[in-house]
Structures are given as structure tokens and as C-alpha cells.
Amino acid sequence: MITSTILVLLIPFVCTSLGAACVLFMKNELSVKTTKMLSGFAAGVMIAASVWSLLIPALEQSQSLGKMQFVPAVTGFMLGMFFLLILDTITPHMHLDNSVEGPKSNFSRQTMMVLAVTLHNIPEGMAVGVLYASWISGTTTITRAAALSLAIGIAIQNFPEGAIVSMPLHSTGSSKLRAFVYGVLSGIVEPIAGILTILAIGIIEPVMPYLLSFAAGAMIYVVIEELVPEMSEGGHSNRATIAFMVGFCLMMTLDVMLG
């Protein structure tokens, strides 16, 4: 069980690495339209995962509270948002539009871009870890298939995310190999966050609904803070909106079919 769980936790990281490898084979950087579509797709997957795989199970696990079953979901959701907000505030990082956030530092542009993506990958790793911890505990209705569907959904959106990281790094002066390595490193935090969450199962089991919604709040914060501005940058485009819908439907389908 442990080996198979670790392997599943590595799937999103592997897909991030494969996406980052695009910089080794593609001659031209991603166009603005392509980047917007990929951001829209990733946003759709993350919103659907937050709702279907995290918030709904959090509400279901709180049914014993009756009409107050929303309390764990709302509390965890807001805590997840504040968690990412604090990380965004204390960590120097740079978004793809070259806007800098956080305290002043001597970090290079490349390092700050990687830090931005790394920060936003933490809730994705936590989300997969929380679902697997919930399944391993055996005290909830969450199945192994449900946890696997989330891991697959995150992995699918990680492929374009890896390319979105490595390609701009190369265009700003990094060598292809260096850009690839940075892209890979941006995703390594996901399996680490997932494994740490599972290892803490004895502590987190009593507060599982809070943690499920915590991961959802953190992921939706990433969507609003990072992906929505990227998919909306420049002129209006229906392509990014369509890509969002496709990503949402794909993740919803995975959750229903496998969960």
C-alpha cells in the first residue's frame, strides 16, 4: 500500500517534469494565446477538483453536525486562503507577467519565477495527500479511486504548467537545460507535501473535513491570484474560457467515473 501510494503521489511531479521537458524540444516559446489557454485549462481542473474532490467530501464528512455541517468546510476554506496569502506575502516571487511580490531580495528573476510556481504547487500536493490519508484512515467514505482521480487530474494540468514555467525561463536567458531543471524543481514540492500530509494521518484524522476544505481554499486562491489574471491578460479571448470549461468537465468526469 505504501509503495503504491508514493508512486501515485509522484504522478503529478512526473507530469510537471514532462511538461518542463518541452523546452528541450520546442524551438519557439509559447505564444500568448497558447499560454492563456493552458492557464484556463489548469484553472478549470483546479476549480473542479476543489469542489468535487475536496469541498463536497468535507461537507459529507460533517453531516453529523446537522445544519451546522458547513462550519468545517467554511473554516478550512478560509484558513487555506489565508495560508497561501501569508506565503505570498513573506516569500519573494515573480509572476509570469513579470510583476514582483513579497519582500525585497537579491534573488534572480528565474529563481523568483520558480518560487512563485513552487508556492502554488503546495496545495495541490496537500490535496492529493489529504485524500489518500482520508482513504488510508478507513473512517470516511473516500475511496482509493477518488484519491487516484484527483492525482490524475492534477497530473494532467501539471503537464502544461511545467511548460509554462520552463519556456519563459528559457526566453529570459536561461539555457534549455537550466530552464528544464528549474521547471522540474518547481514541481518537487507536490509529492513532498503529499507525503508529509499522509505521515501526519494520526494528527489530522479528527480534523479531516477542515483539511479537505483547507486544500480547496488554497487551490482556489491560486486560481484567482495566478491563473485568472494569466488567462485574462491582454485582449479578450474566448479560447481561455473554453479551455477552462474543458478542464472543469474533465476533472468532474474523472471524479465521478473513478470516485
Locate predicted features:
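Intrinsically disordered, metal-sensing/regulatory segments
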Residues: 1-259
